[in-house]
Swiss-Prot record:
Every VWFC domain range: 98-164
Lineage start: Eukaryota, Metazoa, Chordata, Craniata, Vertebrata
Domain IGFBP N-terminal: 23-94
CTCK domain sequence ranges: 281-355
Function field: Probable secreted regulatory protein.
Chain residue ranges for the region called Heparin-binding: 274-310
Signal peptide (UniProt feature, chain positions): 1-22
Naturally occurring in which organism (per UniProt): Gallus gallus (Chicken)
Name this polypeptide is given: CCN family member 1
Length: 375
């Protein structure tokens, strides 16, 4: 009985060795280009089958081989068909990946598509992730650009910033800084204002933001007012989701969006089994045993005992109150490793203010990020 069960596994191993032997041989010494290849929007870099060089990952229905692997972060694998001697295949979605529905259309797991000219999206195991193709529209122009405005360019999809160089606009800009900050205002004083300068049509105005970062920086830019918003709510009320924030804490002082993996609670978690007598809520629960985080088919190298938010019996919802962000290394089946930011819950709170987090609305839309779509 045992020998019969081992035969399929042995045959699969021999088939894999045959494919490796017939495939392109790996060089004795790795020789890679000095510069990394430029990939299309939404396409990441992955190591080739020899573990030598970074190459652009092949996408759904594209040709693949040992030296041109598929994008495993999107649930794709190289399908060589039934021939054991095949060295080239086609990128197909793994069988366990779920399709996605977007705008009444069905997309297969791992399939990339453009819903419009400004976004590139990918279906990842039932969730849709999108990246902007017009990054200049997301960031503000330099402060030295008077009366900026976004204008349409003939023949192009993305709008571009233009500056009004008129004398009146320059005087308005100079008067703004003289009045609001004073000409001798230090960079530290500007940072403590905890305000972000927003340049809008018709002039400039101050917008409050949340959670300003400490003033000390690895880089110094005297013209940059470093500000960072709070993390958004997790895109899922159970299971793995995404949380985002906006910051200009970078050498270019450009507004960028950062993401982190989050999990408010595991799906299928018993809601009220652990409630003590007379209690209506379970705020924070710790994982009973060490677990590995999962992301895009890959698992964390180490095990953790994270805290989760509980639930209530009186209609209130429990959401994270205090969190921290840690860097966690993930490893995939092919040996590839990468690091992602992950939310760690420190405490939760329960209240009746449940926008998009009520159990009656299990998913909500998070623009330009991984989310579930629901009509």
């Amino acid at each position: 009985m045992g020998s019969a069960g081992a035969r399929p596994a042995l045959a699969a191993a021999l088939l894999c060795l045959a494919r490796l032997a017939l495939g392109s041989p790996c060089p004795a010494v790795c020789q890679c280009p000095a510069a990394a290849p430029q990939c299309a929007p939404g396409v990441g870099l992955v190591p080739d089958g020899c573990g030598c060089c970074k190459v652009c990952a092949k996408q759904l229905n594209e040709d693949c081989s040992r030296t041109q692997p598929c994008d495993h972060t999107k649930g794709l694998e190289c399908n060589f068909g039934a021939s054991p001697a095949a060295t080239n295949g086609i990128c197909r979605a793994q069988s366990e990946g779920r399709p996605c529905e977007y705008n009444s259309k069905i997309y297969q797991n791992g399939e990339s598509f453009q819903p419009n000219c400004k976004h590139q999206c990918t279906c990842i195991d039932g969730a849709v992730g999108c990246i902007p193709l017009c990054p200049q529209e997301l960031s503000l122009p330099n402060l030295g650009c008077p009366s900026p405005r976004l204008v349409k360019v003939p023949g192009q999809c993305c709008e571009e910033w233009v500056c009004d160089e008129s004398k009146d606009a320059l005087e308005e800009l100079e008067g703004f800084f003289s009045k609001e900050f004073g000409l001798d205002a230090s960079e530290g004083e500007l940072t403590r204002n905890n305000e972000l300068i927003a340049i809008v049509k018709g002039g400039l105005k101050m917008l409050p933001v949340f959670g300003s970062e400490p003033q000390s920086r690895a880089f110094e830019n005297p013209k940059c007012i470093v500000q960072t918003t709070s993390w958004s709510q997790c895109s899922k009320t159970c299971g793995t989701g995404i949380s985002t924030r906006v910051t200009n804490d970078n050498p270019d002082c450009k507004l960028i969006k950062e993401t982190r993996i989050c999990e408010v609670r595991p799906c299928g978690q018993p809601s009220y089994a652990s409630l003590k007598k007379g209690k209506k809520c379970t705020k924070t629960k710790k994982s009973p045993s060490p677990v590995r985080f999962t992301y895009a088919g890959c698992s964390s190298v180490k095990k953790y005992r994270p805290k989760y938010c509980g639930s209530c019996v009186d209609g209130r919802c429990c959401t994270p109150q205090q969190t921290r962000t840690v860097k966690i290394r993930f490893r995939c089946d092919d040996g590839e490793t990468f690091t992602k930011s992950v939310m760690m819950i420190q405490s939760c709170r329960c209240n009746y203010n449940c926008p998009h987090a009520n159990e009656a609305y299990p998913f909500y839309r998070l623009v330009n990020d991984i989310h579930k779509f629901r009509d």
